Amino acid sequence: MAIITIDRVISHLLSKQTIAGLDLGTKTIGIAISDISLTFSNPRPVIQRKKFTLDALKLIKIFDHENVGVAIIGLPINMDGSNGPRVQATRTFVSNIAMYTKIPFIFWDERLSTIAAQRHLLEIDVSRIKRENRIDSAAAAFILQGALDRIQILRQNHTEG
């Protein structure tokens, strides 16, 4: 498993592979999966966190089922740009999951992704109880969509250059 940068995504993907977006919480792991054209992110059901090994195995099973070639994981940087304890927890999670997969990971600044997801769910009139169950996957979809949009720009620049 490697940590790569967004500009190296395309070189790591095989034909028809997708990209996963992850929002790592203390109780759940929000998941979103791209389409094969790497244009749209689609939220998936969250993983209810139990023990690291069980969480990792569930995640790897999803990666295999969804033909994931790269994973984008939200990095919860503080609003002032500093790294808090959640940043270290996320980095440790990625380091530990290396025992289970060779899929490369990209850290992606997730500032305001949960707020954006909450606003979106409110705008489409999702009830409070359903919002609680969907917020982490909606945040994962926002994280992934930001990365997919960046990949599209990089692709355009590559074909124009």
From Swiss-Prot:
Keywords from the UniProt entry: Cytoplasm, Hydrolase, Nuclease, Ribosome biogenesis
GO MF terms held by the record: nuclease activity
Superkingdom, taxonomy of origin: Bacteria
Gene3D superfamilies on file: YqgF/RNase H-like domain
SMART domains, per database record: YqgFc (SM00732)
GO CC, one annotated term: cytosol
Compartments it resides in: Cytoplasm
Keyword Metal-binding: no
One GO term (biological process): rRNA 5'-end processing
Top EC class for this record: hydrolase
Protein role: Could be a nuclease involved in processing of the 5'-end of pre-16S rRNA.
UniProt family annotation: Belongs to the YqgF nuclease family.
HAMAP family in the record: Nuclease_YqgF
Cross-referenced PANTHER family: POLYNUCLEOTIDYL TRANSFERASE, RIBONUCLEASE H-LIKE SUPERFAMILY PROTEIN
Entry protein name: Putative pre-16S rRNA nuclease
